[in-house]
Swiss-Prot record:
Seed. Keywords: Disulfide bond, Protease inhibitor, Serine protease inhibitor. This is Seed trypsin/chymotrypsin inhibitor IVB. One of its GO terms (cellular component) is extracellular region. Pfam families: Bowman-Birk_leg. GO terms for molecular function: serine-type endopeptidase inhibitor activity.
Length: 72
């Protein structure tokens, strides 16, 4: 669906198993659009994290200059 296509993650952690088990550990006011189990802390603004695991990482949400420096 479109939710998976629009989902993004800046910080994705994967195990070294084959296939890998990956989880997005971004913390924000909402979870990404494809998240099924989103846990939010009752704070203002809320701090939400997705606890789904996949065999892949979603694309990055932000292409910051810092990330570009690391790639070069």
């Amino acid at each position: 669906g479109d939710d998976v296509k629009s989902a993004c993650c800046d910080t994705c952690l994967c195990t070294k198993s084959n296939p890998p088990t990956c989880r997005c550990v971004d913390v924000g006011e909402t979870c990404h659009s494809a998240c099924l189990s989103c846990i939010c802390a009752y704070s203002n603004p809320p701090k939400c994290q997705c606890f789904d695991t996949q065999k892949f990482c979603y694309k990055a949400c932000h292409n910051s200059e810092l990330e570009e420096v690391i790639k070069n």
